[in-house]
């Protein structure tokens, strides 16, 4: 059954500026008067944030690809039950910094688990609750990783498990995101992130405005 709210997700490999664009879009939608539920993955709930710490901790080096995928979907199950579905039922616009496409890109392609196992888990956990619009921030992995490393230096923070992965890993993840976009062109829009922040945000706003206009008629 289709819920009354709308579900927008932002995706992309680390270093694309995704979180910056997410915050700007969130502020813009609120200015327009939309009731927005802002959330993220992994996380979004108390249980989900605990799982997030395990997943991103650089000391979790021995975690297997399958364990990583199952933990992602455990956090997602809690997130859907506590946050996403209730907000959609209230008629809100749900905006999530990553959702299930990240599992397909990172675990399906990056970890090479394949698409079948990710889809099987997704059917069980997400079912019919899928994003209505997904914006993928796209950038060459070599450039994105340099950006991410610069951010870590500015914040004096440790590299997380995913940011510490090889260039080849991030190339596979990017390939995954672009494959999803080719398979679902109506839902998934690719936004080139190799431009000034304001220019990227302008394109994102245009895409979202067109989407909202279609769905609010």
Predicted ranges, named:
Residues 10:
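Hydrophobic anchor at the beta1->P-loop junction of P-loop NTPases
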Residues 13:
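P-loop (Walker A) phosphate-binding loop of NTP-binding proteins
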Residues 18:
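Conserved lysine of the Walker
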Residues 21:
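Hydrophobic positions on the alpha1 helix immediately C-terminal to the Walker A/P-loop
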Residues 26, 142-217:
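NTP-dependent small-molecule kinase module
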Residues 32-126, 203:
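ATP-dependent small-molecule kinase phosphotransfer cores
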Residues 103-175:
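A glycine- and Lys/Arg-enriched "phosphate-lid" helix/loop adjacent to the NTP-binding pocket
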């Amino acid at each position: 059954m289709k819920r009354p709210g709308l579900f927008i997700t932002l995706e992309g490999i680390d270093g694309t500026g995704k979180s910056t664009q997410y915050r700007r879009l969130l502020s813009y939608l609120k200015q327009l008067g939309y009731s927005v539920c802002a959330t993220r993955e992994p996380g979004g709930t108390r249980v989900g944030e605990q799982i997030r710490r395990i997943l991103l901790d650089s000391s979790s080096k021995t975690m297997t690809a399958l364990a990583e995928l199952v933990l992602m979907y455990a956090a997602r199950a809690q997130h859907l039950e506590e946050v996403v579905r209730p907000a959609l039922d209230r008629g809100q616009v749900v905006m999530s910094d990553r959702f299930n496409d990240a599992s397909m890109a990172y675990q399906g392609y990056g970890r090479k688990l394949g698409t079948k196992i990710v889809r099987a888990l997704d059917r069980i956990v997400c079912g019919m609750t899928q994003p209505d619009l997904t914006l993928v921030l796209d950038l060459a992995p070599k450039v994105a990783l340099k950006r991410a490393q610069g951010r870590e230096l500015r914040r004096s923070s440790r590299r997380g498990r995913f940011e510490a992965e090889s260039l080849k890993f991030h190339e596979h993840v990017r390939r995954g995101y672009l494959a999803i976009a080719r398979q679902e062109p109506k839902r998934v829009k690719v936004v080139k992130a190799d431009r000034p922040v304001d220019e990227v945000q302008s394109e994102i706003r245009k895409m979202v405005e067109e989407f909202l206009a279609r769905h609010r008629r």
